[in-house]
């Protein structure tokens, strides 16, 4: 791992995103770790170290190997508190979407609001991309982009060059320029009543966002088959009064 990361830095890359390390280590996604992180009886080869120590050692090897080249580290599918100080940025939520607006709200807006306390303390937080163009109306996606651009956190955009109309491309450019300026972290104001905060303080000024479509939020299982199974298991347990 150390040699691989060092080589990538020597090639001239300035940002390395390492992903899927938690599922690689334990064989399960976070949503599958209901009570147990791995299959019954499974363990690391070195039983003299705890799982936390082994994970932290991995993050440290990646971080230290990137230092000589000055390469920045973005962790994804990582365990946040163990990565504090060992990654420059951390993707703090699940994937947002350029197709499913609900997914962007659940894993973008919610993540930005409720993982914000980690920003600047553990690492710079990244609530995932503004995904365009896709099936999401620009009037909604532009709001997500504006919030990210003024949030004080990292902003990433997934877009095919030349695919946007001129006015949208200009607006996107303004968002990216705004995000490049250092600013105070955004503060959700209605977070105690709303899991998808609509009222925010940006640069000291209150601003309201309107996330919901006229017909309401189109709710589905945005996490796919894994979360569908998790939901069935939790629902069955609740029905059986096991928890």
Name the predicted role of every residue range.
Residues 20, 75-77, 134, 159-161, ...:
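Active-site proximal loops enriched in glycine and acidic residues that flank catalytic Cys/His/Asp
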Residues 127, 159-165, 187-192:
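Short coil/turn segments at secondary-structure boundaries
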Residues 133-149:
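Structural motif
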Residues 1-134, 168:
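Aromatic- and carboxylate-enriched substrate-binding clefts and catalytic-loop regions
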Residues 148-152, 156, 190-243:
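Carbohydrate-binding surface patches
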Residues 22-23, 79-81, 155, 162, ...:
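Short, solvent-exposed loop/turn segments at secondary-structure junctions
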Residues 147-183:
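Catalytic cores of secreted or luminal carbohydrate-active enzymes
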Residues 138, 142, 169-183, 187-190, ...:
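Loop/helix patches that line or flank the sugar-binding groove of alpha-linked glycan CAZymes
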